[in-house]
Amino acid sequence: LEQMKRPLGRPPQDSKKKPTKTTIVENAIQLFLQNGYQLVSMDDVAKNCGVTKATVYYYYPTKADLFTDAMVQMMLRISERMAEILSSNKSLKVNLHEMVKVHLRATFEIDLKAFTKEAKVSLSDEQLQQMNNAEEMMYNVIEKAMTTAIENEEIPRGNSKFYTQLFFAILSIGNYRDTDQKSIFSTIDEMAEQIIDFFWNGIMGKK
């Protein structure tokens, strides 16, 4: 009877467990971040999830489809976490500092620039647009916080979109690695403090 209720070809679901598609995406995110786009196969994802390769292909016809959804879901979660941090009653500077630390803890061991460059050559224009839209959501969360801070006279009047792009540009330095794969600063706390101080002193006009 249960077999008849689900669409033909759809993998069986255990109602008490996390949805299979969610499990696939979560494992794919980790594998892609750890190993890069090219080195991860659909078989790797299936084995990591404890499902068949056919199950992965049921939800995602191609690796590019899986990668796109994995990255979109990851950015949506980041946006939600950013919004949660920025919604606290603390100052913008304190909230941004906390957000930078959360970001760096999640990505400190990853060369994000090389990671995204490697993957983008394999994606269609539509898939790239999906990722760009998700990325824009992250920017919007920060931009809204910047706008509120300007209205509350917490930071000087200026273009909140410019402030936002400046913030993300400086934030990306946290993922910089030299030829020996070493970061500029040895600890996440020190990196976060340097990023925030540089950004804050810049928009506040301090020299």
Language model features: what each stretch is:
Residues L1-L8, N140, K144-N152, A169-R177, ...:
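C-terminal peripheral helix-coil segments that are non-catalytic and often amphipathic
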Residues L1-N35, V40-V51, D65-T68:
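Basic, helix-initiating cap at the start of DNA-binding domains
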Residues Q34-Y37, Y58, N152:
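Helix-turn-helix/winged-helix DNA-binding modules
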Residues C49-Y60:
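Short hydrophobic/aromatic patch on the recognition helix
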Residues D69, A83-E109, Y163-F167:
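Hydrophobic alpha-helical connector segments
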Residues V72-I78:
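Short, basic, alpha-helical segments at the C-terminal edge of helix-turn-helix-like DNA-binding modules
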Residues K93-V94, Q129-E135, T148-F168, S186-E190:
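All-alpha amphipathic helical-bundle segments outside canonical DNA-binding/catalytic cores
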Residues V102-K144, E151:
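Short secondary-structure transition hinges
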